[in-house]
């Protein structure tokens, strides 16, 4: 449901009715549990919850990186976080899908090229990105949509001097943080990248997320990348995972 409809419906439901909401309406509401089971302590909260808000796609990628950094003390809450998100056009909803898939689309058009948007720095996922990550300030975020259907990567640069950590500490901390995660895989620091880079649609058709970490030769700059399907772990896959937990089913039942 759209945000307004979700807010209108909720007062009509009994408190003991289990609700899984996919809009942005309740993601920062203290009365709701955030639907990212891999965050520390979150799985048990979701299991026992009657109100779970499914994360936004871009937010999922950013939070998967920023939350552990702050929670583990690898970066301060005051750190000036920024990120870039690259997505297939399905991430823009029905209107954008129709635009990209229109039979009237010219053979060569502006849609062939990546498009940055949200340049007013007020993307609707920013409130949850800040709150769930435990940040003192709103992160700077620029999304980019490209001419392919689905798949997403979110890139978070980290100045290790400002963060007060080493690359090894960051890599070890994040690996331990997600060691028991059912749907998140952490790659080793500077692990050889497939095809010397990361294609944003590499995880398309899956409900999993993979995290990559690289560091420069000087050891003072890192790039952390969350790679997943915006329609999978960034949307319906996350919803199914949370539903399974709320209903007492196997966490990954029905997931790819």
Q: PLM ranges: what are they?
A:
Residues 63-70, 126-130, 175, 212, ...:
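Predominant activation on well-ordered alpha-helical scaffold segments within soluble catalytic domains
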Residues 80, 84-85, 89-224:
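C-terminal substrate-binding/catalytic lobe of Rossmann-fold NAD(P)-dependent oxidoreductases
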